[in-house]
Amino acid sequence: MAGYISDDTRKVTTHRLIEMKQRGEKISMLTSYDYTMAQIVDGAGIDVILVGDSASNVMAGNVTTLPITLDQMIYHGKSVVRGVKRAMVVVDMPFGSYQGNEMEGLASAIRIMKESHADALKLEGGEEIIDTVKRILSAGIPVMGHLGLMPQSINKYGTYTVRAKDDAEAEKLIRDAHLLEEAGCFGLVLEKIPAALASRVASELTIPVIGIGAGGDVDGQVLVIQDMLGMNNGFRPRFLRRYADLYTVMTDAISHYVSDVKNCDFPNEKEQY
């Protein structure tokens, strides 16, 4: 199946993302956590690579995103940046690195930027973290917001169900979205909210709105790379489209290798020195 490969090799920046929204060009975004995957994703033409705290789940096997540390996020960020030439690299600030006072948040943000060489950071929350967002922005660090389902708040809500289905929560989300834009955020992720609400937010904001489980009437889409490649065999949420079945492909390849080793078929004469 033929895919889309951009012939534009210029580095993606916050300014270019806003230009893409203005001309109606959708923004593509995927997660990556290591050098090899980042090279592949960047070479395939992705616009934004998110070094997500979802590494806690898909790389470390944790049930939630909460355990991943600042040092671990910096490690993953460094690994991804080394493999990228064109895409913008955004790193998630992990739980506990910015929810305290704003100066602690700024110190965490500066560490990530200095040590990983990422292009921007992403934070979950609205009004409750707006002072921290402003403080980080005042240091010249680009910030992307994240509203709707916020995995770092799983213990508050107790479930990963769709958020902002009632009027009160929807209105708060809209207010928070405007607060984040007014503070200076260059973009916003909306996760697992009604499509009509996401469409309204995208139409009201001048900054790009990227959806995950938020319908198609937004400015772009983001998915976890392991999910869209079909590497997590039992994970099939409604919003996910699987573009490959790598779980089966990889299992078959490894099984074939095991068989060849057991049967002394590998290495053969041509595979020796």
Curated annotation (Swiss-Prot):
Q: Which cofactor does it need?
A: Mg(2+)
Q: How is the cofactor bound?
A: Binds 1 Mg(2+) ion per subunit.
Any one Pfam family here would be Pantoate_transf
Broadest EC class?
Answer: transferase
Keywords annotated in UniProt? Cytoplasm, Magnesium, Metal-binding, Pantothenate biosynthesis, Transferase
> Which residues are noted in the entry as 3-methyl-2-oxobutanoate-binding?
D53, S54, D92, K122
Q: Pathway of this protein?
A: Cofactor biosynthesis; (R)-pantothenate biosynthesis; (R)-pantoate from 3-methyl-2-oxobutanoate: step 1/2
Residues in the active site? E191
Protein name (Swiss-Prot/TrEMBL): 3-methyl-2-oxobutanoate hydroxymethyltransferase
**Species per Swiss-Prot/TrEMBL record:** Bacteroides fragilis (strain ATCC 25285 / DSM 2151 / CCUG 4856 / JCM 11019 / LMG 10263 / NCTC 9343 / Onslow / VPI 2553 / EN-2)
Question: What is the gene called?
Answer: panB
